[in-house]
Amino acid sequence: MALVHKLLRDTYILRKFSKPTSALYPFLGIRFAEYSSSLQKPVASPGKASSQRKTEGDLQGDHQKEVALDITSSEEKPDVSFDKAIRDEAMYHFRHLKDEIVDHWRGPEGHSLHEVLLEQAKVVWQFRGKEDLDKWTVTSDKTIGGRSEVFLKMGKNNQSALLYGTLSSEAPQDGESTRSGYCAMKSRIPRGAFERKMSYDWSQFNTLYLRVRGDGRPWMVNIKEDTDFFQRTNQMYSYFMFTRGGPYWQEVKIPFSKFFFSNRGRIRDVQHELPLDKISSIGFTLADKVDGPFFLEIDFIGVFTDPAHTEEFAYENSPELNPRLFK
């Protein structure tokens, strides 16, 4: 029903604007917009598209010039097959849904249950092309009037992602903000068929594994859980990642038990364990108040099981150890 409503709305917009432009793409489906933009604009006949005018005779002489105008008749409309657009959009999502059902019966992500149970390590994100960069988004304090800038591109030989930019802690001149200076990179929420929100299940692993190369700056690694409650949209679990600098790669291993709970950027007194069975996204934030250029190169981001790590949770919440929190 939602798909039909979206396409009917797209039909109305396309009738109001006979020539699809990039400004309409946010209102149209991706595949529907590509289909509409591929249509050829009808060309007006020479008889209807030409007119004559007389130039200034006193200055340049008495001669006329025919000026061709590209005018499209109001009766001529683009030949749009909305049935085909609806059918293509629906078939695309149904094929995606079929793949999800088949993979579910085979096992998690199409792997057999035996392989999943024996899996000790898994690469979740790697950067080998532009399609891998499209799974991420970058932001900075420029959205609130700051001066920091951040960019994301493929690294050398298209074997890594390079996050770079300039950090500025100068506060915006808006009369309200007193602090500024951050740059961030965040993964997009995975989507299934019919744009359903998906999540990652890392419950069988206990450690985050990264291969990075930085300039010596400290970064904050943020993990968000999948939730449908509006009150939890600003909640996340964080821990620090320290880069060494220099030309060599470093392997960073962070146990999930070390991640602490925060809300709206403030660490909470009552801590909670990271729910590994419903991970929504992961991100990296730089806010060390050191103005100047920075970079962080990422080879891959994965998870693995470390048999030497037996800690379940690093922060105690029992009433016996901290009774003030449980009054």
Curated annotation (Swiss-Prot):
It holds the Pfam family CIA30. GO terms for biological process: mitochondrial electron transport, NADH to ubiquinone; mitochondrial respiratory chain complex I assembly. Transmembrane segments: none annotated. Residues 1-24 form a transit peptide. Residues 53-63 have a biased composition (Basic and acidic residues). It is found in: Mitochondrion; Mitochondrion matrix. InterPro entries: Galactose-bd-like_sf, NADH-UbQ_OxRdtase-assoc_prot30, NDUFAF1. Part of the mitochondrial complex I assembly/MCIA complex that comprises at least the core subunits TMEM126B, NDUFAF1, ECSIT and ACAD9 and complement subunits such as COA1 and TMEM186. Interacts with ECSIT. Interacts with ACAD9. At early stages of complex I assembly, it is found in intermediate subcomplexes that contain different subunits including NDUFB6, NDUFA6, NDUFA9, NDUFS3, NDUFS7, ND1, ND2 and ND3. Interacts with TMEM70 and TMEM242. As part of the MCIA complex, involved in the assembly of the mitochondrial complex I. This is Complex I intermediate-associated protein 30, mitochondrial. The gene is NDUFAF1.
